Regions:
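Short, charged/polar "capping" segments at the starts of alpha-helices
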Residues: 2-10, 97
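Active-site-proximal specificity loops/subdomain of glycosyltransferases
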Residues: 7-53
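GT-A fold catalytic core of metal-dependent nucleotide-sugar glycosyltransferases
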Residues: 24-28, 42-96, 119-120, 126, ...
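Short, charged, surface-exposed secondary-structure boundary motifs
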Residues: 31-35, 95-100, 173
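Short, flexible loop segments at the rims of nucleotide/cofactor-binding pockets, characterized by
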Residues: 36-40, 95-96, 140-141
Length: 174
C-alpha cells in the first residue's frame, strides 16, 4: 500500500521478463484490526487476498520470502482442492492442536495452519470470507495470539485445509 509509482517502476525495471500487476490495498479495509510493531496490518493482506485479487484468478500460491524452492511446484499448484479452502502444512502434533483450540476458543481442534506455503482456493474463499468476522475474531482474541495470521486462519478455516506433507512443501526448524 505504501509503494510509490517510482518504487513500482524500479521493480518492473529489475524484472523485465516478468509480468507484474500491482494491487492497491486501501488501508481503511483494515481499520480496527489489532496491530503491533512486530505484526503490522500488512499481515492481514494474505487473509484478504481472495477479495483483493482479480476474479479471473482461481488459485494463488503464497510463499514466505524466506522459502527455498528446490523442486518444481507444478504438481502442487495443479492439485485438486476438493472442498478445502487452502492447502498448507502444519507443524503441530495432536496435543498442540487441542491446546491451540482451547487458546483460540475453537469448538473442535483443527490442524494449526503454517502460512509459509499456502495454496488458496479463491472461488471458495470469495464465497465465504467475511473480513468483519475476521476483524471481530482478531479483536476478541488478540491477547492470546502467538502468530496472528496463522491463529486466525486456523481458528476460522482450520477445518477447511488440505494438509500437505511438510517434509516436501514446508520443512521448518520449528
Amino acid at each position: 500500500s505504501d509503494l510509490t509509482p517510482a518504487d513500482e517502476e524500479r521493480v518492473r525495471a529489475a524484472l523485465p521478463e516478468v509480468g507484474l500487476h500491482f494491487v492497491f490495498v486501501d488501508p481503511a479495509m483494515f481499520d480496527g484490526f489489532p496491530e503491533s510493531k512486530r505484526y503490522p496490518r500488512q499481515i492481514y493482506y494474505r487473509i484478504a487476498a481472495p477479495l483483493l485479487l482479480p476474479d479471473t484468478l482461481e488459485r494463488i500460491l503464497y510463499l514466505d520470502a524466506d522459502t527455498v524452492i528446490i523442486n518444481p511446484l507444478t504438481q502442487l499448484y495443479a492439485a485438486p482442492f476438493g472442498d478445502a479452502y487452502f492447502m498448507a502444512c502444519t507443524h503441530t502434533r495432536k496435543l498442540l492442536e487441542k491446546l491451540n483450540a482451547a487458546r483460540l476458543g475453537m469448538d473442535e481442534a483443527a490442524p494449526y495452519i503454517n502460512t509459509g506455503v499456502l495454496l488458496y482456493n479463491l472461488p471458495a474463499l470469495r464465497a465465504d470470507l467475511d473480513m468483519e468476522r475476521v476483524r471481530a475474531f482478531a479483536d476478541k482474541k488478540q491477547d492470546v495470539f502467538l502468530l496472528p495470521d496463522q491463529d486466525i486462519l486456523t481458528a476460522l478455516y482450520g477445518d477447511r485445509v488440505h494438509l500437505l506433507d511438510s517434509m516436501v512443501y514446508n520443512l521448518s526448524d520449528r
